[in-house]
């Protein structure tokens, strides 16, 4: 049973039936197992206090110029700066010195000496390969240092640890929650400790050049997204009918003929029934983005999941895997091929005063994945996807455990899909996360509005849990997107297509049926509980049709039982979203005045002093 809360039909609320109790997860961390009764914000302060003492590095600088690095001249180039906008940027001239060898040598020398700073001075620098950090090294950009990374994919398949023949020399990476051998990220580290990426200020720039066309090609890194012409409101700037084109067959969502015609070729251990279950109907599973998921579901080892050259999975800008004592501070990243930052399985990660500035496709700002003890503060995000998304692996790839003990504070978000997001890549679970004192500016609300302010997303494929999440003191002066967007539902779903605006339009969205058509294997029901949100204040903007803050105020789509496609016996328990509290909030004036909220499969949603339009809610809802 679902309910859209309609002020003309309040009787629906009294008639809403209660549902079964939510089971706890068996993956709770020792750090928080006994803390449910104490003030959760004391837990947050304890996490913050862990970072009071900075990471120590030896007091020795290694200038990259001492190892042969030379600045380069730049020339103007017309390039994409978003999916629908081009501008004149700068790019290195054709004969620019490649500083990759010099930077790699400086890092090696610094590491061998016991650590210190590898310094990139002011100027323009061309780097045709990844900057790979080693333990006890701080790579530091002086003010005015602009590092232009090569936009040639082959340069990120030249130096990796794994020689994969025609696919290149690849690195162990993680792509949307699944491990694989692929292009290195532009800044990379694996298994290191005491490392830092720092700058003097936001004029210290790491530039991925993702919107600059490949040599002798009309396509760029962002073309690999394979996105068709957008049609929804806010996707195309006024007066523009242009968007990034792509070569047919050369995208992450194209059927790749290099991928086998049957999983039997790479996973002969699978029964035919299991193989067909993972593949699903047709050949869509042979698209690179789907093929990686299929390999993971089939139990193929990570070092046998080979992509790189001939494939189209874009690299991250910064990806550190299985590292500890990590600092990101005082620089800007821009024009990134894929996610801007993705620490995976890292411990003690401090993010301070960075500018994540890339609005291309999938340009998430900062995505800590299966990380323990993270502080993100005093930073600004302008993104083409989620500003911050807390993740925790996908499907079987949960070896790094949950994301937990994370604080986000004193940050500003301009545009993106979700300002503060949890999931959907969360198979290992997300718990004990605190977000406070944030401004979701939505400064581009006329042309590129923020889709959702506070977003929780999961589904029957990713599973996992969301619990003990606390959010307070959020200012959203320019509202969010005021038109709805939807995900297609599965055939036979109890949720009619285009009936629940979980893709865009609600200030607070808990979506347990996220994009269900994208996954063939849907056997892991998510568990969502103990979410507490307070003091969220949303402004209205003049849309021409009136003063509005959003399309709806709150959407809670609990797990949809009909999405499950696993065995009937034994079947996992599918339980409602439980114990969500929203208090002391003014969510503005939603466009959908008749139905300002939507609820499905939720137990104990507590509203305390929550103003929506002209109504103040004080009630507990179970639907």
Regions found by a protein language model. Give the residues of each.
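Beta-rich accessory regions
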Residues: 460, 465, 472-485, 489-506, ...
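Right-handed parallel beta-helix
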Residues: 143-144, 193-204, 324-334, 347-358, ...
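Asp-box/BNR beta-propeller blade signature and adjacent active/binding-site loops
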Residues: 66, 80, 100, 104, ...
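Alpha-helix capping and helix-loop boundary segments enriched in small/acidic/polar residues
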Residues: 93-97, 342, 363, 367, ...
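Short, recurring structural edge motifs at helix starts
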Residues: 125, 363-365, 395-398, 421-424, ...
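Extracellular "leader-to-stem" segments immediately downstream of a signal peptide or signal-anchor
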Residues: 2-130, 134-138, 142-321, 338, ...
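Short glycine/acidic-rich loop motifs that flank beta-strands on beta-rich extracellular proteins
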Residues: 115, 127-130, 150-152, 209-212, ...
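Short, T/G/N/S-enriched strand-turn elements that build extracellular solenoid repeat scaffolds
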Residues: 107-109, 127-134, 339-345, 378, ...
